[in-house]
C-alpha cells in the first residue's frame, strides 16, 4: 500500500489522516507542538464540521460556551453563543484520536523536505528520516513552497492587504467566560476570557499604515491600546495582568498559487488562509481538508483521472478562498465611520466587487460536466451550475439534479417529481423554490 506522509497535526492534517485511514492507507503524521497556547472562538457550525470530520472526541475537554458581544459601526449588540476552544487541550485530543485510528505519530520539528517524482524524504529533528510516496502539507500559512522541480506552471496565487495580528495572553482573576469583538479607527480587536482567568486580546492592523514600534516596545504598545478602549477596560474589569505574553503573526489572506500535484497536496491554511474576520480558521481548514482523502485516493489509484482530481481540489480551494474573502470584505464595508482610513479603505474593496452570495435565477441554471466525489474517488458527472454554486451541484437528498432538471424542462413538475419518494419530493421542491423556480 502507498505510504503517505502528512506534515502538521492541526484540524486539517488530522482530518486528512483520519479520512485516509478509513480508506485503508498507512499514514505517518509529523508535527511539532504549537509554541503559543492559543484560544479560538468557534460557532456551532464549526463544531458540527469537526464532528463530521470524526474529531468530536478532541473537543471533549477543550470547549467553554461564551456570550459574544460585538461593537461595530457605532452599534453594540450581543450575538449568539460562541464556544471558546482551548487549542492545547484540543491539539492533545487530536493526537489521541489519530493514535486510536492507527496513524503513526512522530513528534518533532521538520528540518527539511526533499521531493522528487519518486517520492519524498523528510528530515525531523531528533528522529529518523521519513520516506513516503505521497506528501500532504498541512503546516498552516507559514508552510514553505514545494521544490521548484515539482511545481506545474505558475498558478495564480492571491494575497490580500498585508495584515498583522498582535495577540496578548495573561492571567487575570477567575470569573465567567466571555468574548467580544470591536472595531477601531486603524483596525479591530477580539478579546476573550476563560472561567479560569486566562485572558486573551488580539489587535489586527494594516502592516503598511500601522507604524508599530520595535519588538521590545510591542507589549507596552498593546497594553496602552487596551487601556485606551473603554470596552476592553470594562471587559477585563481593569484586572491585574500577570504573566503577560505577546505573539505576533501575519494574518494576511493568502491563496497558494498551486495546491495539488501528482504526488503532493496542500490543505488547510497551507492551501489558503483568509482574514480572521472572514470566518473561523478551523472551518476554512476543514473545508479543503475533507475532500483531500478522495483526491489523494484518485491520484494514487486512478492515474488516468489525475488531471480531474487536481482540477477538483484546485477549483474548490480557490472558490472557498474567494467566497470567504468576499464575506470578509462585506464585514469591513459595514464599518462606515472610518471608510477613508487606510485599514478600512484597502479591505472594503478587496478582492473585487462581486457579491458574496449571488442572487437566485432559475433561468440561469445550466448543466455541465464537472468533477465530483463518488465512492471515495474523484469522478466526472453532469452537475447543475447555479449563480451561487459555479462549481455545480451533483445531487440533493440522493437525487441527481441534472436528470431532474432535464425532466422538469421537458415534462413539467408533476411528472418530473413523480419518481421521487415523499421525503425526496419535499426536499427537492424546497430546493427548486430556493433557486427561484415558480410552478
What are the residue ranges of the model-derived segments?
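Acidic, low-complexity/disordered tracts enriched in E/D and polar residues
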Residues: 345-407, 426, 430-439
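Beta1/beta-strand and adjacent pyrophosphate-binding region of the FAD-binding site
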Residues: 1-10
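Predominantly flavin-linked oxidoreductase catalytic cores and closely associated redox partners
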Residues: 99-235
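FAD/FMN-dependent oxidoreductases across multiple families
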Residues: 84, 213-329, 336
Amino acid at each position: 500500500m502507498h505510504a503517505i506522509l502528512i506534515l502538521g497535526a492541526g484540524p486539517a492534517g488530522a482530518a486528512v489522516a483520519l479520512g485516509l485511514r478509513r480508506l485503508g492507507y498507512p499514514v505517518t503524521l509529523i508535527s511539532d507542538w504549537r509554541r503559543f497556547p492559543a484560544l479560538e472562538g468557534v460557532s456551532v457550525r464549526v463544531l458540527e464540521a469537526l464532528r463530521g470530520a470524526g474529531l468530536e472526541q478532541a473537543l471533549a475537554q477543550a470547549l467553554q460556551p461564551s456570550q459574544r458581544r460585538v461593537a461595530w459601526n457605532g452599534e453594540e449588540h450581543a450575538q449568539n453563543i460562541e464556544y471558546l476552544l482551548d487549542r492545547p487541550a484540543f491539539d492533545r485530543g487530536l493526537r489521541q484520536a489519530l493514535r486510536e485510528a492507527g496513524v503513526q505519530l512522530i513528534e518533532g520539528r521538520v528540518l527539511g523536505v526533499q521531493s522528487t517524482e519518486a517520492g519524498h524524504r523528510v528530515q525531523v529533528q531528533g528522529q529518523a528520516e521519513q520516506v513516503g510516496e505521497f506528501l500532504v502539507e498541512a503546516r498552516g500559512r507559514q508552510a514553505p513552497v514545494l521544490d521548484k522541480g515539482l511545481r506545474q506552471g505558475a498558478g495564480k496565487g492571491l494575497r490580500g492587504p498585508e495584515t498583522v495580528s498582535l495577540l496578548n495572553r495573561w492571567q487575570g482573576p477567575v470569573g465567567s467566560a466571555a468574548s467580544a469583538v470591536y472595531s477601531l479607527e486603524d483596525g479591530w480587536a477580539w478579546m476573550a476570557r476563560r472561567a479560569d482567568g486566562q485572558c486573551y486580546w488580539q489587535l489586527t492592523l494594516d502592516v503598511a499604515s500601522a507604524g508599530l514600534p520595535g519588538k521590545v516596545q510591542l507589549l507596552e504598545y498593546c497594553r496602552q491600546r487596551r487601556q485606551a478602549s473603554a470596552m476592553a477596560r470594562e471587559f477585563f474589569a481593569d484586572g491585574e495582568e500577570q504573566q503577560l505574553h505577546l505573539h505576533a503573526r501575519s494574518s494576511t489572506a493568502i491563496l497558494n498559487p498551486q495546491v495539488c500535484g501528482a504526488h503532493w497536496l496542500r490543505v488547510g491554511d497551507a492551501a489558503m488562509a483568509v482574514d480572521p474576520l472572514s470566518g473561523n480558521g478551523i472551518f476554512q481548514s476543514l473545508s479543503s481538508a475533507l475532500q483531500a482523502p478522495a483526491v489523494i485516493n484518485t491520484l494514487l489509484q486512478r492515474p488516468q483521472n489525475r488531471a480531474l482530481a487536481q482540477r477538483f481540489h484546485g477549483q474548490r480551494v480557490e472558490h472557498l478562498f474567494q467566497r470567504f474573502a468576499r464575506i470578509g470584505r462585506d464585514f469591513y464595508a459595514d464599518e462606515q465611520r472610518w471608510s477613508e482610513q487606510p485599514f478600512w479603505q484597502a479591505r472594503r474593496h478587496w478582492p473585487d466587487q462581486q457579491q458574496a452570495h449571488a442572487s437566485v435565477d432559475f433561468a440561469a441554471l445550466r448543466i455541465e460536466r464537472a468533477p465530483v466525489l463518488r465512492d471515495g474517488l474523484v469522478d466526472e458527472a453532469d452537475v447543475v451550475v447555479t449563480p451561487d454554486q459555479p462549481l455545480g451541484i451533483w445531487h440533493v437528498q440522493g437525487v441527481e439534479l441534472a436528470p431532474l432538471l432535464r425532466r422538469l424542462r421537458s415534462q413539467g413538475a408533476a411528472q418530473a417529481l413523480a419518481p421521487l419518494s415523499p421525503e425526496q419530493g419535499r426536499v427537492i421542491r424546497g430546493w427548486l423554490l430556493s433557486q427561484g423556480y415558480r410552478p
